[in-house]
């Protein structure tokens, strides 16, 4: 029992502190439980979206590979060199923002195309222009899917770690802090009850002692009164015959 409670002095002030702590622990448990449920729900949604994004990525990359093969066939094998030489500024860009989910900030990545930059407008002008344009569109969708997948996987990793930490806190509060606090409160209540019983027994003994002393004093006073009354009766009895003798003597004198 002592190992499952806190080492405290059993006083009423400590009891009040433990009750406040228990109330705070219950509130914290409720909040963390709701937070864990909200994060778990979002985690499952992200997991489903990751599966969908991976399937979409597979289809897009397969289409992109065929499109690149068509471009290579239509324009020649040096298309890669031409593309690298044409690029000066990134046209496809990514911006990041943060989303607050139950106090957890998740990084969100969004891709966008700068319409003012178009370094590939002359690529494929000689031949294969249609295939090059189609490949550009397909690979743009592929990059968008990659950015979406990266955003989801980043959120997945963050949520996974936060959920583990939150669940550990929930379990610690539920199985350690709350039981220890309840055991401490029960211990303090039992000790205070024992102190109350001891105090009641002590007061009862003091009251009995006072009652015995009062009864003893009353008995002594009664005994003194009885003795005084008895002495007064004896004195009265001794004085009464002398008065009768005196009267008798006077009567004898008158008759004689």
Swiss-Prot record:
Its main location: membrane. Residues 211-256 are annotated as: Disordered. The keyword Ion transport applies. It is a peripheral membrane protein. Pfam families: ATP-synt_D. V-ATPase is a heteromultimeric enzyme composed of a peripheral catalytic V1 complex (components A to H) attached to an integral membrane V0 proton pore complex (components: a, c, c', c'', d, e, f and VOA1). Interacts with RAV1 and RAV2 components of the RAVE complex, which are essential for the stability and assembly of V-ATPase. Subunit of the V1 complex of vacuolar(H+)-ATPase (V-ATPase), a multisubunit enzyme composed of a peripheral complex (V1) that hydrolyzes ATP and a membrane integral complex (V0) that translocates protons. V-ATPase is responsible for acidifying and maintaining the pH of intracellular compartments. This is V-type proton ATPase subunit D. It comes from Saccharomyces cerevisiae (strain ATCC 204508 / S288c) (Baker's yeast). The lineage of its organism: Eukaryota, Fungi, Dikarya, Ascomycota, Saccharomycotina. The gene is VMA8.
